Amino acid sequence: MKCTNRKKNKVCVFLLALSCILSGCGAAKYDMPYDSNYPVSSFQLVQTDDFQIATPFAADLCVVDTNVSNEDVLLTDVGSAALFDTDGLNTLYAVNANEQVHPASLTKIMTALVALKHGSPDQMLTATENVKITESGAQLYGIKPGDTMTLDQALHIMLIYSANDVAVMVAEGVGGTVDTFVEWMNEEAEALGATNCHFTNPHGLTEEGHYVTAYDLYLIFKEALQYEMFNEIIQMTAYNTNYTGSDGNQYAVDIKTTNQYLNGNYAMPDGITVIGGKTGTTRAAGHCLILLARNSSGKPYISVIMNSDSTENLYLKMSDLLKAAK
């Protein structure tokens, strides 16, 4: 079309604009360098029939920001405790769940998680001088510098027997140094949203700046349960293997679980099956326990108690807590 006067020019402009709109020019976007200032915005509207929503970070997690009471539970003299319905995503009970406490050997859950994430079960580990832990009362298997075993073997001994010296062996074998491995532990905690905890070692012996919360332990334990090997180990009542000593000889391992439900020293609550978990005890942390359990319908729960005053009271209180797992 040829426009020959002002009136026709206006018509031409209108028709050209309409043509651009109908042909999609209205959806054009302008490319421009990110480091330059322009007086226009660059955007594009896309029409779709799909209905989409963003998935919240905690969409598959239980959440707790305050104490939660339960008529079936009456706990006293514990540092913190919580019971989580992992299918229904409900917090059934919580007391001081976000209070920072000493974790003792529950630290080893994070150690196992990071080792499984960064290592391979068949990789060989060699003990260094750093496995010599001299703290009084520390649970040790007794490995010596130069002893070797696979990560698979080490994780079994670390989780079932709660061996602190083997935790160091795992950290150095997988991370190269304890410091690097502990860095990974803290990075993993942050990635999981466990933002109220901080680790300074892989075993859980008391150190300044080494702390967790009951809720953060739930997050870490839940993630570790995604690994088949971790699931397998925490359910075992005993473990036997052989490792190679620094002298080249084979040494037998014969250990039993520290979980008093699994070894039969304490009866499981009626209608509850304890699948497995992790124990922890130090003078600063008291007696601690985290468990995966199922009720009579097979529904899974995670329960945790921190800083109980004795082993007996720990298991009595845990049995009381699990009564709410209906």
Describe each region flagged by the PLM:
Residues 28-215, 224-225:
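Active-site-adjacent loops and short helices of periplasmic peptidoglycan-processing enzymes
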Residues 25-36, 194-195, 206-211, 215-326:
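Domain-terminus/edge residues, biased toward the C-terminal soluble/receptor-binding domains
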Residues 1-3, 19, 197, 206:
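Conserved, well-structured beta-alpha core segment at the onset of a catalytic domain
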Residues 12-18:
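Sec-dependent N-terminal signal peptides
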Residues 20-24:
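C-terminal motif of bacterial Sec signal peptides marking the signal peptidase cleavage site
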Residues 3-12:
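Bacterial N-terminal signal peptides that target proteins for export
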